[in-house]
Amino acid sequence: MKMTRLYPLALGGLLLPAIANAQTSQQDESTLEVTASKQSSRSASANNVSSTVVSAPELSDAGVTASDKLPRVLPGLNIENSGNMLFSTISLRGVSSAQDFYNPAVTLYVDGVPQLSTNTIQALTDVQSVELLRGPQGTLYGKSAQGGIINIVTQQPDSTPRGYIEGGVSSRDSYRSKFNLSGPIQDGLLYGSVTLLRQVDDGDMINPATGSDDLGGTRASIGNVKLRLAPDDQPWEMGFAASRECTRATQDAYVGWNDIKGRKLSLSDGSPDPYMRRCTDSQTLSGKYTTDDWVFNLISAWQQQHYSRTFPSGSLIVNMPQRWNQDVQELRAATLGDARTVDMVFGLYRQNTREKLNSAYNMPTMPYLSSTGYTTAETLAAYSDLTWHLTDRFDIGGGVRFSHDKSSTQYHGSMLGNPFGDQGKSNDDQVLGQLSAGYMLTDDWRVYTRIAQGYKPSGYNIVPTAGLDAKPFVAEKSINYELGTRYETADVTLQAATFYTHTKDMQLYSGPVGMQTLSNAGKADATGVELEAKWRFAPGWSWDINGNVIRSEFTNDSELYHGNRVPFVPRYGAGSSVNGVIDTRYGALMPRLAVNLVGPHYFDGDNQLRQGTYATLDSSLGWQATERINISVHVDNLFDRRYRTYGYMNGSSAVAQVNMGRTVGINTRIDFF
């Protein structure tokens, strides 16, 4: 067992309440709100951090219909997939999913529930807002929160009737249809909602062996229901949500490295089409109880996922069905009320994940390799987050989290008739801390500084590898130092930050696709600056601009890649958009024009596979035809810029996945109420 400590942070988080409780209440501020993101408007953790919140109308205007399109509205975030949608490659502030495709650098939450890693890329249904927290969020969110947190908050049913249907078509025979109905079942007591979604995003890649010409896309069917029991004049409420998602995809589609404008896949003669089917079931029970001084939240959530995946890899045909089960329980207590000197959040957390993988690599004439593996991972944690309001302008915050992680693996198989197998167990303890301080220079201008830790627990490879023992990799740990500012008025919003993150014992994937193994690759340093601004220069009109410059490198004492750039981290990025409303006698017109720039980055630790700088231009025009009818047209990637989204070495040559190119579409929404 190994205990990791950072005494100044952990002790600071523990001692802060004792110091603060010796002070008298000196201010009168708004009530602390506990949201699905665990943050509140008064807490230091919410104010002394770089964050972005995007509303549902802003998501709709930008055409964000799935989580992998969130970079359009969340500056600094990069999301692609490595092979297919099961394995997201995410980077934020120089922290990258190159470290582990099964544990993205940024964790996705939906209504406060962490999603399975293989469910990070998903369609969005009935979203109310999306929140991005940058930098390690380990004290509140625990493992795999080194780069930050994406929290999706969905619309909860209440006494207001809501309902709509949506429909749209776009390039490559793609289409989208959606139905939503929400409101009171018995007003003052019980509320409910239902959402149905069918989303087809076909590709245009060609397999010469089969003649298929629509590869590289996805087809998703999703349904969810919610019930909310909230009696009037009672201090408690309960909720239940259930959803099912099934997606079929043909995304394991690659072209030659230098053939990014081509449509023919780089495959051996006679290779079948790639195919993947993923089905995910989710259930959540929640409860809230409110007193004069405290609010208590309880969440219990379960996810079950199974997928089948077949794809050609050189002369081999790979079959990799997999099953996942995850359950999460969390009890959280937070202070309520005005004029508090100290605000506090305390919580207990448990997460248990179980996985089974069957894999088979077959040659045209005989089996090459087959294996069956079982892995488990469990986290037990207790956390505390505290804010001491020294004056009405100055506050300090501190937090501490104690986590106990354990994992196990058991696998067996055969390679060319030779059996192999092993098993193992490991456990680890972590103590994480964070400290921050913020000061309001004026009523509109805040400056802050923050030190925070993040980590990824020790564990085992998900995919068994012949010839390798069941040896665990050690926990990966990081610490982030940040200095930032935020300025906000009715017309201007501006935030900027500079940061430095040091990561040690990085967990990095290496090896051929389908046979990658995780190992600790040493240390890395990431430094950068970021800027985000919005100017509301006229009624109904706004101009957004953002940019970042990041240097993320393995240190010289890293065993495998010393001095190299960390994969999947662009050296710089920028974006700008103009949004407006033009009133006419025939209804409001809503134009939008957006440009996004992504800097050069690598797909491998050896820095041999490089994607250069590229920019895309998106445009849309909405028309509010009546109070209840909205029609919009959009053109994404107006100039049809083609670029690589992922690549790897296939023997002595490299192959790449490429983006879809220009997409033209039209959408219609009709509201019922």
UniProtKB/Swiss-Prot annotation:
Sequence motif TonB box, location on chain: 30-37
Function description: Receptor for the bacteriocin pesticin and for the siderophore yersiniabactin.
Species this protein is from: Yersinia enterocolitica
GO molecular function, one term: siderophore-iron transmembrane transporter activity
Domain TBDR beta-barrel: 160-672
Protein name as catalogued: Pesticin receptor
GO CC terms, sorted: cell outer membrane
High-level lineage: Bacteria, Pseudomonadati, Pseudomonadota, Gammaproteobacteria, Enterobacterales
Subcellular location(s) per record: Cell outer membrane
Miscellaneous note of the record: Weakly expressed by yersiniae located in the liver and the intestinal lumen. Strongly expressed in yersiniae located in the peritoneal cavity. Moderately expressed in yersiniae located in the spleen. This probably reflects the availability of iron for yersiniae.
Sequence similarity: Belongs to the TonB-dependent receptor family.
